[in-house]
Structures are given as structure tokens and as C-alpha cells.
């Protein structure tokens, strides 16, 4: 009797174990019900944000490999990174819902999608979200710069400089270094000096700070007028001495301050995923997020950049440039380089100062293909000079330009072609401090 009871109890226990195992096995198989189809932001079934900014384009796909692991594929979701795959951990939260989270690396960023074999991560991306059986998915993604190069943080435009022995500022907010050989040495030196001063006055009025954030955003404190002043921006050489005197303060130093607005009128551009940055090999790469810029209106979106990155409009752009004398074969590499790398500048970080600059090595591939445009400018100015119907304002602007060219030792804009051909050193730089 005891043996019978013991046997019956053992059988019941075994049945309970088998039933429990069968129940767990069935529960473990629920992960196979996780939707593995592609979700698009445009459809409304994918609610996505990157750095807390909602994403309106792109598609995602979650592929589960077990009850605890899967891969989240994001296409055209992370700005400037066309395809990003992240290994995620899965957790069943009930009601046919699964939470996921994970972190991955980004090895290549580009204005447009390009194949890369680079194995050094420049960004990390972390994700968390939820997917349910009703085929809806929510994702919160956050990016973080790995390739910082000492650039991260706020950089204020240089606004104060001591004079050198010739009473010229030793450094300026916008600094142009220009050296040429032979008969063009004086012209290059004069242009470097004058344009540094005039350019610094303009820059000091329009830019106060650049910020390179940890999540990769490039932001700025800047100023722009709501009204068109009608000013062509051509420097008036008659005002040069007066400008120099106004820049010198009681302390004998040069002070570059806003001239058309107050300090309280600066505009802060918040992080909005408009442009991303990373530093590598002594170069700073700034990549515009074209998917966002193309949705912006008016002057906020740069037409050339948008059209150059739109393959359907590229041929039209090249045709227009060809009509102006630009060889499409020479300008195409410039456009392709921009598509791959965005805006590329060299940089030097020293203690609490930063210099961003483009030297002759970076400028040459851009300047040379565009030099034929100067011939068109020659003709335009010649036609203006012969036209008796131009306005008094146009006459004044033409006179300023002719005076400026005379100071630089030029008779017409196309003379710059010879100056550039004999240029031995060139750099245009912006200087910042912490």
C-alpha cells in the first residue's frame, strides 16, 4: 500500500514537472510572434526619436533570434548614417509587448550613403523601445561622439587681440593668410591683411559661439537681421582707417564686438539634428542633415547643398555651372567629396583656444574649378560700367569694387587667377576661445 501511494505521488510530481516544462516551453516560444516586418516612420506605425528629436523619415526592423536577444536595423533614421544595426536585449512585458535596449557603433557618417570599410567607430548609438503584436514600434535613440579630438564643448569667438609692433592685431576672429611669389606677393599680402579686418568685423557681428555637443550636434549663437539692408557687403576702402580706430579700445587692444545689434539680441540655435560633427586625423567633419534641411523654408536651407546632394538635380546643377564656364569633370569631385565627408576643416586645439581653418590643400580642389567664373564676372562688371541706366546705388557699389581691386593691385576680377596660380601659402581661419 505504501509503495502504491509512493508510486502514485511520484507520478503526480513527474506530471506536474512535465506540465510546467511544457508551459515554460510554450512561453519561451512567444518571441517568435514578435513582428519582424519593416516599419516606416511615414506610416505612423513607427514612433522614433533621435536625441529627443522626432524622426519623420526612415524605416526600422527588429529581428529576434531568441526570447532575450535580437537585432534592430535602422535605415535612414540616424542622421548622416544611412544604415545602423544594433544588438538588443529583449524582455517580454506582457500583453504581446516586448521591450528592447542596446548599444552599437557607427563606423561611417556621410551626407549621402557611401560604402565604407572603416573599422574604427566614430559614434556610438544607444536605443530603447517597445514593440507589440499589433505591429507598432517605438524607439528612442541617442548618439554619442567617440572621435572628439578635444573639440567637444562651447567655443566663443575671439574678440580681443593685442597689437604687434606695426600696430596690427596679432590675431583676428577671421584670419586670412595669403602669400604669393613674384609680382603677386604684394597683392596677396594686401588681400590677406585687408580681408582679415573687414571679414572679422562682419563675423564678430554675426557669430558669437559655436558648440560641439556630446551627442554630435553642432549648434551656434548667432545673429541675422529680418530685414534686407541691400548692402552688397563690398568693403569701402574709405572706411578702413575709421574701422581700425573704432576697434582699438582704451587699453590699446583690438576689440571685435557686434556693430548692428546688442549683446541681448543673439539667437541661440538649439540642438535639432541639423548638422553633426566628428574629428579625425586633425580634421573636423561637419555633416549637414539634408533630410531635415530639405524640409526647412527659405534661406534656412542652402539651395546649392540640397541640390548637389539630390542625385536627380545633380545633372541640372552641373549644366548650369557649365554655362558659366565651369568644367563639370572638375567640379564633380568637389561635390562627391562633400557628399562623402560634408564640410572638412583642419583644426588646432591649444590650451583654451581653437582654430578652424582651410589651407591651400583643402581650398585648391574647390577654388580651381570655379576660377572660370571670374571671366563671367569681368563681363558683368564691364556691362554695368557701360550701362547708362544703372542706379546710383549700383554705380556706388561698382566704384567701391573698382577701388578695392586697385588697392589689391588688380584691374579686373579674373586677375585673381594669376594670383592663385602663384600662391605659395593660403589659409582662411576662424579663432575661438573657451
Features from the language model and the residues they span:
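Bacterial N-terminal signal peptides that target proteins for export
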Residues: 1-9
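Hydrophilic extracytoplasmic domains
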Residues: 247, 252-275, 279-434
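N-terminal glycine/threonine-rich, aromatic-flanked beta-hairpin/loop signature
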Residues: 55-87, 169-303
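C-terminal motif of bacterial Sec signal peptides marking the signal peptidase cleavage site
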Residues: 16-20
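Residue-level recognition of conserved beta-strand positions in structured domain cores
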Residues: 102-104, 141, 222, 288, ...
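Short, surface-exposed beta-strand/loop "edge" segments at domain boundaries and coil↔beta transitions
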Residues: 78-85, 107-115, 145-149, 164-167, ...
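Acidic/polar, low-complexity intrinsically disordered N-terminal segments immediately downstream
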Residues: 4, 22-193, 197-200, 207, ...
Amino acid at each position: 500500500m505504501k509503495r502504491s501511494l509512493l508510486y502514485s505521488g511520484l507520478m503526480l510530481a513527474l506530471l506536474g514537472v512535465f506540465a510546467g516544462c511544457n508551459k515554460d516551453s510554450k512561453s519561451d516560444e512567444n518571441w517568435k510572434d514578435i513582428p519582424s516586418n519593416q516599419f516606416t516612420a511615414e506610416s505612423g506605425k513607427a514612433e522614433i526619436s533621435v536625441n529627443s528629436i522626432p524622426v519623420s523619415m526612415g524605416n526600422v526592423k527588429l529581428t529576434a533570434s531568441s526570447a532575450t536577444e535580437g537585432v534592430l536595423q535602422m535605415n535612414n533614421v540616424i542622421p548622416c548614417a544611412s544604415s545602423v544595426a544594433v544588438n538588443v536585449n529583449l524582455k517580454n512585458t506582457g500583453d504581446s509587448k516586448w521591450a528592447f535596449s542596446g548599444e552599437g557603433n557607427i563606423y561611417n557618417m556621410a551626407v549621402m550613403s557611401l560604402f565604407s570599410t572603416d573599422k574604427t567607430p566614430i559614434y556610438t548609438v544607444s536605443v530603447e523601445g517597445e514593440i507589440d503584436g499589433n505591429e507598432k514600434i517605438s524607439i528612442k535613440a541617442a548618439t554619442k561622439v567617440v572621435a572628439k579630438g578635444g573639440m567637444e564643448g562651447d567655443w566663443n569667438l575671439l574678440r580681443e587681440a593685442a597689437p604687434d609692433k606695426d600696430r596690427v592685431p596679432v590675431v583676428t576672429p577671421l584670419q586670412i593668410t595669403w602669400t604669393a611669389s613674384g609680382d603677386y606677393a604684394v597683392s596677396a599680402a594686401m588681400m590677406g591683411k585687408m580681408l582679415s579686418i573687414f571679414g572679422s568685423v562682419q563675423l564678430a557681428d554675426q557669430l558669437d559661439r559655436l558648440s560641439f555637443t556630446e551627442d554630435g550636434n553642432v549648434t551656434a549663437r548667432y545673429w541675422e537681421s529680418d530685414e534686407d539692408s541691400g548692402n552688397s557687403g563690398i568693403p569701402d576702402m574709405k572706411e578702413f582707417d575709421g574701422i581700425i580706430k573704432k576697434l582699438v579700445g582704451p587699453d590699446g587692444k583690438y576689440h571685435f564686438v557686434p556693430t548692428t545689434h546688442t549683446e541681448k539680441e543673439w539667437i541661440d540655435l538649439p540642438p535639432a539634428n541639423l548638422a553633426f560633427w566628428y574629428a579625425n586625423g586633425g580634421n573636423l567633419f561637419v555633416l549637414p542633415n539634408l533630410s531635415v534641411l530639405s524640409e526647412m523654408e527659405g534661406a534656412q536651407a542652402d539651395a546649392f547643398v540640397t541640390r548637389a546632394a539630390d542625385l536627380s538635380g545633380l545633372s541640372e546643377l552641373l549644366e548650369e555651372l557649365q554655362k558659366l564656364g565651369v568644367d563639370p569633370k572638375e567640379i564633380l569631385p568637389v561635390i562627391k567629396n562633400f557628399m562623402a565627408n560634408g564640410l572638412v576643416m583642419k583644426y588646432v586645439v591649444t590650451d583654451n583656444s581653437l582654430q578652424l581653418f582651410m589651407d591651400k590643400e583643402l581650398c585648391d580642389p574647390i577654388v580651381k574649378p570655379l576660377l572660370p567664373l571670374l571671366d563671367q564676372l569681368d563681363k558683368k562688371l564691364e556691362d554695368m560700367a557701360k550701362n547708362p541706366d544703372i542706379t546710383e546705388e549700383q554705380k556706388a557699389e561698382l566704384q567701391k569694387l573698382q577701388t578695392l581691386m586697385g588697392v589689391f593691385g588688380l584691374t579686373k576680377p579674373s586677375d585673381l587667377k594669376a594670383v592663385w596660380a602663384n600662391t605659395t601659402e593660403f589659409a582662411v581661419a576662424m579663432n575661438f576661445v573657451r
